[in-house]
Amino acid sequence: MIENAGIDYKELYLQMQSAVVALSKTLEEIQKENKNLKEENEYLKRKLFGTKSETSKSLGFEQLSLFDEAEAEANPDEEQFILEEVKFNKKKKYKGQLDDKLSKLPHIEVIMTLPESELVCPVCNSKLVPVGKKFVRHEIEFVPAKLKVRDVYTTTYECRKCRANGKSVMKSPGIPEPVIPHSYASAESVAFVMKQKFVNGVPLYRQESEWKQMGLDLSRTTMANWIIYSSEHWLKPLTDRMHGILLESKHAHADETPVQVLNEPGKKATTKSYMWVYSSIKESSYPIRLFVYAPNRCGYNPQIFFNGFHGTVISDAYSGYNNIEGCVNAYCWAHARRKFRDSLPNNLENAENTLPIIAMNKIKKLFAIEKEIEALSPDKKVKIRQLKSKPLIDDFFSWCKSNQNATASAKLSRAFKYVLNHEEGLRQYLYDGYIPMTNSLDERVIRPFTTGRKNWLFSASVSGAESSANAYSIIEIAKANGLDPYKYLTTIFTYLPSQDLIKNPEIIDEFLPWSKFVQKNCK
């Protein structure tokens, strides 16, 4: 018989019980983590392989990618979640639609005639004479780009009478300054290179081959130097001036997107840098879109940009915008909606009463109100928002607080946490008719940059990234002011180099996109 040798079975039992509890807790945590990872995996698979457009009218939301969240307000009147088959109706063509489309293009007439030998009547052999012409069709003719060289000379004039009297009096016309000193670059060629890269997304290595096909060996290095010099000397004074104008306003949009810079001092080539985008609001008399390069995503970047600004910053609630002195933060409801959309269950067949759908339908009602009051004055918007939107928002946040702990989904928990943590900023639009419900304006401004980034992938240097920021700024500002970006760039590069901005800094205002001179010449 084996003796117990003084073993305290009660203590041993308690230890084993404690171990079982600890193991059960560990197992529960592992199962929870596993569930969250499965949820995240399914979400990423939907993002990667799923449909790129929504098929539900009740959702009514466009696909919101990371930096490309257009405000999806179309068809917000459906309040219940009902999946529907999308029907594609052929767009009806109206008489005169093609004529309107072609009206801005130059027209030439091509008149088909009979040869002289056939101008004979088949009945009596008399000569046929023209009695009218009948329109047959329009054809679009493509004229390939061609290069030519402008050989610039200056004429020297002399007074012969003074010469006869032993005096030498000569006079020559002033010569406009070139866009780049000691270069064969013209205003048009630099503007074209920028348009191709920053409007059409054509990287310099592809432009290099296109220029060669047109008859000129123009290296990508030369084009890069053109962009950097012209941006620094002629575009930056304009973006600096418009930065000052934006700081004088009371509202501004802000957003940011990553960019890779290869040769940045003190950083690995794989490290993320950022392009920050700041814009005036839709109602502004001076539409401004400014791209600013920064080596990181730290909050001091917007703090530096908004130094001296006293107003409301509309953003996606990124914490980097929280500590801007003198600023009120208004947050984007499209981002709030996206948090719930990302937490949707994989199977939407019986999703009508799930928490994400309920949340999205509550937010959808707010978007429907904004659609109704879109054309109203800011004062009237505030009145209707207080009357209609505020009760819905009160109900929404009350509902979120009641249901925030009623889910095991990590994504849905984060969605509740997001909206509750940013309630004050999400409510700001209720009190100011100039504040939009979303930050979609800045996200649309970023879109050309993110599209172009897919083609050129990275900037080779800090100076290249900064020049890209100035170029994107001027191009997006041109679009916002109804200008042709190529014409605006050409005008800047043609006239600004001959101006003395140090002695006459006020002359820069003549080149702002809303000036009479620019509006007349750059449409």
Q: What role is predicted for each listed range?
A:
Residues 1-181, 224, 253-254, 385-388:
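Short, flexible loop/hinge motifs at secondary-structure junctions
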